[in-house]
């Protein structure tokens, strides 16, 4: 029997499935110099959970999330922003069979169009995030 419905994510180009490592209400570090230090994940861009009751959306490297700034400069605190996940602690498997895990969970603050707000990224950036978001790759110092 053929599968009904469209692709898994509507409007987002297909990508290799990664193990989710960051969920709602997770506190994550900010890896750029935008002024925020710690943010809380409050939403996932492109996730619609009305079909599955009580499902908590999870994100992995390269996904865009909605965050609330918890720690940082006074003018940045309590703002609702968008961010891209560039590192996750949970191990995920790449198509070549290697497993990758980072020391912390980290995001990069971006605008709604995907333009990076900072001018540099501290620490490594996952290759999956760099391939999906070229603006992040252009300011990254290390891509793993």
UniProtKB/Swiss-Prot annotation:
Q: Which PANTHER family match?
A: 50S/60S RIBOSOMAL PROTEIN L14/L23, LARGE RIBOSOMAL SUBUNIT PROTEIN UL14
Member of which family? Belongs to the universal ribosomal protein uL14 family.
Query: GO CC terms on record?
Result: cytosolic large ribosomal subunit
Name of the protein in its database record:
Large ribosomal subunit protein uL14
Q: Name one GO biological process term.
A: translation
Q: What is the lineage of its organism?
A: Archaea, Thermoproteota, Thermoprotei, Thermoproteales, Thermoproteaceae
Task: Determine if rRNA-binding is one of this entry's keywords.
Answer: yes
According to the record's subunit comment, the protein's assembly and interactions are:
Part of the 50S ribosomal subunit. Forms a cluster with proteins L3 and L24e, part of which may contact the 16S rRNA in 2 intersubunit bridges.
Function text: Binds to 23S rRNA. Forms part of two intersubunit bridges in the 70S ribosome.
User: Which Pfam families does UniProt cross-reference here?
Assistant: Ribosomal_L14 (PF00238)
The record ties this protein, via InterPro entries, to: Ribosomal_uL14, Ribosomal_uL14_arc, Ribosomal_uL14_CS, Ribosomal_uL14_sf
Q: What is the protein's species of origin? A: Caldivirga maquilingensis (strain ATCC 700844 / DSM 13496 / JCM 10307 / IC-167)
**Alphabetized HAMAP family for the sequence:** Ribosomal_uL14
Keywords for this protein: Ribonucleoprotein, Ribosomal protein, RNA-binding, rRNA-binding
Per UniProt, what is one GO molecular function of this protein?
structural constituent of ribosome
